[in-house]
């Protein structure tokens, strides 16, 4: 009976210790030097809602600390849902700045709050919208090159006919003097081929492609972005995690 009683006491003490360690209110784990991965395992019991109660400004500051030093650019998108989906993906994977080129507005509802936590730049001058929506908008190539220079960006075009992401080492982008910007084109027309040719001499210029194993003309641009950003994240030796 004494042995059984002692076993029960030991189990109770063990449960109390575990509760104290895992309870975010005790903050004991905050002072322990754990690797980011182990810290995430210990702290995953925390209530995410409590983090968001700290306010938008604080969350944006946290996002900046954990950005993975890459930008994303969308060119002349038509659909707000695609804008929002890619913005959310960019936020999740630690984007530095999200560039919207050639679109005067987007539906903030499709972003589900991600537009509050990342840097967003909208440029309405590079691509001129035409009165007739069936006509492909004109791109000012010189303004585009100037924009890349001013923002210190290396263009990584995501388009068919480029280097397969299967063979590409995303860690090469870490050695560039400029920030890498993944560029996604219009849902229907893709990226202007002449624009790509104009950027060939820009440092870090690349065209990356997602290999296709089935017979279809193209892949949805949001799905395309999710594949590219995930491949970049998982291959990046300098990636940061929360």
Predicted segment positions?
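Active-site/ligand-binding-proximal alpha/beta "capping" segment
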Residues: 157-213
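RNA substrate-binding interface of SAM-dependent RNA methyltransferases
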Residues: 34-37, 42-162, 226
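Short, glycine/charged-enriched secondary-structure capping and boundary segments
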Residues: 86-88, 113-115, 170-173, 196-200, ...
């Amino acid at each position: 009976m004494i042995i059984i009683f002692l076993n029960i006491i030991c189990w109770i003490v063990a449960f109390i210790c575990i509760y104290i360690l895992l309870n975010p209110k005790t903050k004991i784990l905050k002072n322990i030097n754990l690797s980011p991965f182990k810290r995430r395992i210990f702290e995953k019991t925390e209530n995410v809602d409590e983090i968001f109660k700290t306010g938008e400004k604080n969350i944006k500051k946290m996002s900046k600390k954990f950005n993975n030093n890459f930008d994303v650019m969308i060119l002349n998108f038509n659909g707000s849902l695609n804008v929002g989906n890619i913005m959310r993906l960019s936020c999740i994977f630690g984007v530095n700045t999200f560039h919207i080129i050639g679109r005067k507005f987007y539906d903030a509802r499709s972003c589900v709050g991600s537009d509050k936590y990342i840097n967003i730049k909208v440029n309405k001058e590079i691509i001129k919208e035409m009165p007739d929506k069936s006509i492909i908008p004109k791109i000012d190539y010189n303004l585009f090159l100037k924009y890349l220079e001013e923002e210190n960006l290396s263009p990584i075009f995501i388009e068919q006919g480029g280097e397969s992401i299967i063979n590409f080492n995303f860690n090469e982008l870490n050695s560039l003097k400029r920030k890498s910007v993944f560029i996604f084109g219009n849902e229907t027309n893709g990226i202007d081929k002449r624009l790509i040719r104009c950027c060939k001499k820009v440092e870090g210029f690349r065209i990356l492609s997602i290999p296709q194993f089935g017979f279809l003309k193209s892949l949805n641009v949001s799905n395309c972005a999710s594949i590219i950003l995930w491949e970049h994240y998982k291959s990046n030796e300098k990636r940061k995690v929360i």
